[in-house]
Amino acid sequence: MALLKISVVVPEGEVYTGEVKSVVLPGVEGEFGVLYGHSNMITLLQAGVIEIETENQKEHIAINWGYAEVTKERVDILADGAVFIKKGPDDRDDAISRAKKLLEDASSDRLAVSSVLAKIESL
């Protein structure tokens, strides 16, 4: 299976880069998945969680909003703010706290924020 290149960038610098099997993005019209060979598109992203599937694990990044450019071979994400949610218990608790702050600052829609936070806490 061909791998997709992905990069997640915020104004402060790069949050994530790598080759992945698939990625699920929080589009404004709903979540959508991207595999190698996807049609070209540019889309707006809403507050949510980017789900990244590598060859041997799943990784998650919370974003407040941004844009994604999708081509056949890569996905480039420019987000206003992002928090990489690490797997370790200490790192995870800190990341969840930072993600919660990021999302609460991004939206006044408490229902949407609560939904995303519930998803993050279940990881």
Segments predicted by a language model, with ranges:
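Structured alpha/beta interaction-core segments
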Residues: 4-8
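Compact, glycine-rich, soluble single-domain proteins
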Residues: 9-100
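Charge/polar-rich, low-complexity and marginally structured segments
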Residues: 89-123
